[in-house]
Amino acid sequence: MGKGGGKGHTPREAKDNLKSTQMMSVIDAIGEGPVEGPVKGLQSILVNKTPLTDTDGYPVIHGVTAVWRAGEQEQTPPEGFESSGAETALGVEVTKAKPVTRTITSANIDRLRVTFGVQSLVETTSKGDRNPSSVRLLIQLERNGHWVTEKDITINGKTTSQYLTSVILNNLPERPFNIRMVRETADSTTDQLQNRTLWSSYTEIIDVKQCYPNTSIVGLQVDAEQFGGQQLTVNYHIRGRIIQVPSNYDPEKRTYSGIWDG
């Protein structure tokens, strides 16, 4: 009597554990100040038509920082918004054989933010299991004619979609200077290993402490990933500029009563 076949193997899929965190940071000028401000606090700030809080003050959108300035002549800089950045999109693949180099010429920048990642990161075994993997990248600056490694990064985990992360480079060389991204991990030559790497963008950052005198502003930081890649819009419900009105005028009811005396 012949032997029966061996037990079949059910392929296992490890959970994706890499998640991009992309923060939208913006300062919106509301108008000439001083103004009274949002009608109902954070409920009067809407991202993609959704208020930041409900009527009881509980968060509807999480991971949000909002800073308000009314527009006085002397007002403090908005905390957490002490820098201004200009992003340059690249979207270029980085391979083992071809590091990617760019030249920075802006004379007044203080720091660089480099955004990079993987298109996907997963390794499939001969039995069909889909497991985490890793890839190593170097970020280098050219100093005195030599490439110097500023960041040595290993991305380790699993994702079936694009994953981006970023690092900040301080202590920059005199301008102009070259920056490059180097892939240390060998390129995949099979569909069983998906680990393509890309340099998404770089952002030139200037450290400033702007007070925006006589201008009412809102500084807003929000985790854009929770909106699934949608373009973000922000709306505000604001009580406007504070001005002098007749003594017999009720600005809430918008009515006059009695005799005007100043």
Identify the function of each model-found stretch.
Residues M1-G262:
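Polar, S/T/G-rich
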